[in-house]
Design a protein with these regions (language model features):
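Surface/interface-facing alpha-helical segments and adjacent flexible terminal/loop regions used
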Residues: 1-177
Length: 177
């Protein structure tokens, strides 16, 4: 789930690496492997899978100095900086690109990566990632995405992402008990 969502936020929609994912969405096949009951939202994504429109909206929302909704934690959390996130992820052994580590897409991909490592201490790392680096700002960020998006795709992906992050956090809390 995090890998899918992280990829959609991290990569430009026209990126060739996303073609298989957008094909799954367009053909309505993502729902078959989606662990949450979000069929209505997934159906809305399927109906609004126009790459040109999605790309235009992506650029207006997330790209450049004048973007409507900066996709970086440091833009939403007072005193936050990208280097803290980079240091945390590096300490867990995650390979990082030269792109900002506090990008929403990077953080969701990091959650997937940490989950894939599945060592005992990685669930603690996953909790730290959510508690310190995702949850303090993602609801505000996703609310702004929903408010500023002009396409049904991004207006739907924002609450779908919010619900998914909430469900993953709940699952982490249950594992801790």
């Amino acid at each position: 789930m995090c890998r899918v969502l992280g990829s959609l936020y991290y990569r430009q929609p026209q990126d060739p690496l996303l073609v298989p994912l957008f094909t799954l969405i367009r053909e309505g096949k993502l729902a078959a492997n989606w662990p949450l009951e979000q069929d209505d939202m997934l159906a809305r994504l399927q109906k609004s899978c126009d790459i040109t429109q999605i790309s235009t909206d992506y650029n207006a929302l997330f790209v450049g100095e004048e973007c409507a909704v900066p996709p970086y934690r440091s833009a939403w959390v007072d005193g936050a900086n990208e280097s803290d996130v980079r240091a945390f992820l590096s300490s867990r052994g995650m390979p990082l690109a030269d792109t900002p580590a506090d990008h929403i897409g990077t953080l969701l991909l990091a959650a997937s990566w940490l989950e894939d490592q599945s060592a005992e201490d990685e669930s603690e790392a996953l909790e730290t990632l959510f508690a310190d680096y995702l949850l303090p700002w993602c609801n505000t960020f996703l609310g702004k995405v929903e408010a500023h998006a002009v396409t049904p795709f991004w207006r739907t992906l924002a609450p779908l992402t919010r619900d998914a992050i909430g469900a993953m956090w709940d699952e982490l809390q249950e594992e801790e008990e």
